[in-house]
Every structure is written in structure tokens, then in C-alpha cells.
């Protein structure tokens, strides 16, 4: 099944719903960063959460950066997303593989940690980007995204993010959902949704059964009539370039650039988001120095 995200709204205007299959996106992230199972699950869940938040909160050329910074061995997770369904990211410690938890699942909570922060920075094209930050409440990440939306954006929501890692450390499936209650919604509807969410299987189990993002939303909302607003392809794509790294080098102090020229006779830059390497010759560095 292809990767895509669907946005829906109930016909009575009481709720918005988003669901995504991001299996190929998370697979590409896993392969680019050589992540081990615990890191893969934590990184993948953050990617899925970023896709959902970006779909709900961005338009046009706007962007966002999600940072999960817990006290677990995985370290910091950073994911950039945009309104077009494109993400890129990195994890500080990709090689974490902890023992399974008591449910015999990957122990994401132990990997991420339970003390730390989840922050979302939106670049909406204004003078200053907007950042909302909340403490981690779970470390499982779905609950942490839900808490962020309630506290930082005052939007009552339910977020589920799920990654299944195969025995050989490849990604089996990855996806998630986000349900947002709109102003004026009936309390009875909220009660019904909460009950259905309690009984619902994991998103990864539904995806393994071949369920589509639309099917995942139906699993949650039941017979409530919904209409689709948009179907958005999603992908992992890095926009790094040699020009961008040259710009970064041009911000280095002149004496440090001279040191690179005289001692190293060049420089190598590696993109944290995709691992691509860029070589700068002595002549390249001299040209950058001359433009300072």
C-alpha cells in the first residue's frame, strides 16, 4: 500500500480527523540513519506525529520542527515537516536496542525517557518563528503529542502513532491518526470516541491487516458521516545542497577558515538529515574566505 495522509471532517462539523500510512517514509529514515529497533520506533513515531501536526497546522510554504528531548538513551530526536507532506530528521543515538517491555513490545518509553520536553517550532513566514513546548508526560510519544495539542494549542485531540519493527530490524509498518474535537461538539460524541479509542487495536495492527488511512478513521468514528478534504502523498526528502553548506562555512570566523585551509587543505561536511557528504577543496574555502 502506498504512503499517504488523509484529512477528513465530520459532516456535522464536530470533529476533524487525520490518518497516515507512513511505512515507506519511516523505512527510508531507518535506512538512511541505520537505526536499531528502539531508535527506529521512537524516531518513526516522531516522524508520524510530525506528519500529522504539519497536515493540521501548516499551509503554503510554512514549516515546522518537532524536537523530542528526553533523558533516555535515544537522545534528541529532531524532525522537520512542511505542508506538502515532506519530512526529514535525525536521532542523536541511532543504535539503541533495549529489551522488550512487559507487553513484549519495543520499549519506546525507556528509549525516549520520561523526563524532558517536546517542542514544536513553526516557521509561518513571520519575523519570528513560534515555539510551543511541553514536558514529556509519557515518553511513548502519542500521549505526548496529545498533551502538546491540549496545552500549547488548546485543541482537544487524540493522537496515536505506531511503528512495527520486523525481527530483522527493518520497518514492517508505520502510521498514525489524530482526531480533533471542534468547538461546540456534543459531549456524548466525545464519550463515544473515548470509548472507541480505548477498545481500538494498535494502528500498526490495522495497517498489517491492509487497512487504509480512511479505514483507520472509520475504526475510530464509527458510523459518523465524514467527508474527505484532502489526500496528501507523504515522503522523506532532504533538501540539503553544497550551496547551503557553503553558506554555513561562510559564517565561520575568518581565522578558523584560514586554519582549515592551511592545516586541512579542505573540509568535509556531512548532512545530519540524510548522511550525504560534501567536499570543499582548498580553492572552495579560499573563495568563501574572499567573500567574507
UniProtKB/Swiss-Prot annotation:
> Matching SUPFAM superfamilies, A to Z?
Hsp33 domain, HSP33 redox switch-like
Q: Which CDD domains match?
A: Hsp33 (cd00498)
Q: Which UniProt keywords apply?
A: Chaperone, Cytoplasm, Disulfide bond, Redox-active center, Zinc
Provide the disulphide bond pattern: 238-240, 271-274
Q: Does Glycoprotein show up as a keyword for this record?
A: no
Q: Which Gene3D superfamilies match?
A: Hsp33 domain, HSP33 redox switch-like
Question: What Gene Ontology cellular-component terms does the record carry?
Answer: cytoplasm
Q: Name one GO biological process term.
A: protein refolding
How is the protein altered post-translationally, as described in the entry? Under oxidizing conditions two disulfide bonds are formed involving the reactive cysteines. Under reducing conditions zinc is bound to the reactive cysteines and the protein is inactive.
- Give one GO molecular function term: protein folding chaperone
The keyword Plastid is assigned to this record: no
Where located?
A: Cytoplasm
- Which protein family is named in the record? Belongs to the HSP33 family.
Q: What biological function has been recorded for the protein in this entry? A: Redox regulated molecular chaperone. Protects both thermally unfolding and oxidatively damaged proteins from irreversible aggregation. Plays an important role in the bacterial defense system toward oxidative stress.
Q: Which HAMAP family match?
A: HslO
> What protein name does the entry list?
33 kDa chaperonin
What lineage does UniProt assign to this protein's organism? Answer: Bacteria, Bacillati, Bacillota, Bacilli, Lactobacillales
Amino acid at each position: 500500500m502506498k504512503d499517504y495522509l488523509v484529512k477528513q471532517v465530520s459532516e456535522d462539523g464536530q470533529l476533524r480527523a487525520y490518518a497516515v500510512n507512513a511505512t515507506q517514509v519511516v523505512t527510508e529514515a531507518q535506512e538512511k540513519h541505520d537505526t536499531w529497533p528502539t531508535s527506529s520506533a521512537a524516531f518513526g513515531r516522531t516522524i508520524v506525529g510530525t506528519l500529522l501536526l504539519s497536515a493540521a497546522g501548516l499551509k503554503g510554504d510554512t514549516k515546522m520542527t518537532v524536537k523530542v528531548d528526553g533523558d533516555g538513551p535515544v537522545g534528541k530526536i529532531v524532525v522537520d515537516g512542511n505542508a506538502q507532506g515532506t519530512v526529514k530528521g535525525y536521532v542523536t543515538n541511532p543504535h539503541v536496542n533495549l529489551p522488550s517491555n512487559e507487553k513484549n513490545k519495543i520499549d519506546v518509553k525507556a528509549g525516549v525517557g520520561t523526563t524532558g520536553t517536546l517542542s514544536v517550532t513553526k516557521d509561518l513566514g513571520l519575523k519570528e518563528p513560534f515555539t510551543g513546548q511541553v514536558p514529556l508526560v509519557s515518553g511513548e510519544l502519542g500521549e505526548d503529542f496529545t498533551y502538546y495539542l491540549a496545552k500549547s494549542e488548546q485543541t482537544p485531540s487524540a493522537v496515536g502513532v505506531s511503528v512495527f519493527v520486523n525481527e530483522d530490524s527493518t520497518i514492517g509498518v508505520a502510521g498514525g491518526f489524530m482526531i480533533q474535537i471542534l468547538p461546540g461538539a456534543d459531549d456524548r460524541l466525545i464519550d463515544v470516541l473515548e470509548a472507541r479509542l480505548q477498545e481500538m487495536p494498535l494502528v500498526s495492527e490495522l495497517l498489517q491487516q491492509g487497512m487504509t488511512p480512511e479505514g483507520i478513521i472509520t475504526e475510530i468514528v464509527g458510523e459518523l458521516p465524514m467527508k474527505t478534504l484532502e489526500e496528501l502523498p507523504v515522503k522523506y526528502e532532504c533538501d540539503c545542497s553544497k550551496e547551503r553548506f557553503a553558506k554555513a562555512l561562510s559564517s565561520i570566523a575568518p581565522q578558523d577558515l584560514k586554519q582549515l585551509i592551511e592545516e586541512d587543505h579542505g573540509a568535509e561536511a556531512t548532512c545530519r538529515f540524510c548522511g550525504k557528504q560534501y567536499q570543499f577543496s582548498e580553492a572552495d574555502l579560499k573563495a568563501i574566505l574572499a567573500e567574507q
